[in-house]
Amino acid sequence: MANFSFVSGAKFRPFSYQEMLQPLQAYTQEYNTIQEGMGELGTKADVFERMANEQTDPQAYAMYKQYSNDLAAQAESLAKQGLTPASRQGLIDMKRRYSSEIVPIEQAYKRRQELVDEQRKLQAQDSTLLFDRPASTLSLDELISNPALSPQSYSGALLSKQVGTAAQNLAKEVRENPRKWRTILGNQYYETIMQKGFRPEEIMQAVQNNPEASPILQGIVEDAVGSSGIRNWNDENILNRAYDYARQGLWNAVGETQYQTLSNKAYDYAMQERLAAAKKGKTEGTPSAVFRSVPKTKVDGDKKTTELNDELQFIQQLRANPSMINEEVERVNPGYPTQYGVNVGGGIYKVKPHAERLQQIIKKYDMKDGNMDQLEQKLQADIRSSAVRDFIYKPNITQSDLISQVIKENARTLGAATESTGLYELDDNRKGDPIKLKNISDYFTGDNDISYDPEVGLIINATKDGKTKSAVIDPELIDDADRSVAGYMNNINVLLENGYDVEAQRYINTMMNYIYGKFNTLAKRQSNTDSKLE
């Protein structure tokens, strides 16, 4: 038996704590990574639970819900079974599915918001713009299946212009009325009229959609609305608004009218007495059970009327004596003094004052073709319309708190939904900047009244501590579904612009009756409610 010995120089070195901990740390780190990944996916996905509506977006909601449930199952498996190859693959699959299932929901939501902002911007540029549907009503399902989807739109102003152009061309071709006498302006003037085109009464019938209106005028409107494609939108309210805009263009069918004006002295004297009494006693205009007309006392109003009459008289003189246009007068340019006390640059020069004034008037009324007939008609129309514009119209509503309550609630609702309260500052008797939602309480003091100024629109007045603040009201704040008030105001503006003051006054009467009836009905309801409570 061999005799030998084995000597080992190895030394025992146990694993350090750090070395034994490394596998556990690696496991824990990967476990946490997967867990955090799933948590992050869950957090992102949960956002879309509030965006996708089960009723309006069933497909998007179902897709989100399935993803959310599968993600929860993966997290539960990780918690129970620990880190496995399946859990690693599960995270990869859920990331892939997030891109294909959740990201489209996110993109659809962003696209819808972009369309909402775009519509708001377009309407700020053109308040007459009509949409086949509000962008806010688009479902996420629609935008997921068709990301390029966009609501159709058409401008009401364009409709009116198209009808106006067609009506104007028609007026020159199809009608010619003989010269005749007629009384207008409530006997204020007698005028000789030669009319080429449609009479205002015929236009009014077509604008009001009277069955007896001219079929030719109705046909123009139908053609314009039909070519716009709005009928295919299947929205009766939008279609009615389109017809309203289109019919306004019919006023261009009123033919060219030449006037020879003879003042009715008896009427002038009686009217002057009434106006003098009204201004002296600050009395009101024609009394009514539902509204009162308050004469304006602004100097600017009197100045404007005087300017209009002076300009009309000048145009009539110029037409009677065209040679006036070439009359010259000499003017002196005093020059300017130098540092040595000597005037330089002075001298006599000639000008044509009548030609200069005519150019100023043409520019003022944008009569680029210089048509003297149209210019004279425009001045006469403005003078006639000033009789209506010189008054402010106030409904006889005693419960001012009801006015304030309705308008304030509607302004808040509109402001929360669209960031526009429908109220605007009254700046120098003009519609100014929009009033923000946070500032509307300044215009609702409990002591409120509303009025209508044909030059501005609807106005709400609020009085507190003896001080009054006023704001212009968007008709939408008190309007009905048919936009009756907006329609009345639009018709009044068109009629006054064309000098049809009698017809405009009728519309004002109708609108004030509507406003009075609306708030008076609320007052009666409130009174009945209070009686029952007692």
Curated annotation (Swiss-Prot):
It comes from the Viruses. GO terms for biological process: symbiont entry into host cell. GO terms for cellular component: virion component. The keyword Glycoprotein does not apply. It is found in: Virion. Keywords: Viral genome ejection through host cell envelope, Viral penetration into host cytoplasm, Virion, Virus entry into host cell. Homododecamer. Localizes inside the capsid. Protein that is stored in high quantity in the viral capsid and may play a role during ejection. This is Cargo protein 2. It comes from Bacteroides phage crAss001 (Bacteroides phage PhiCrAss001).
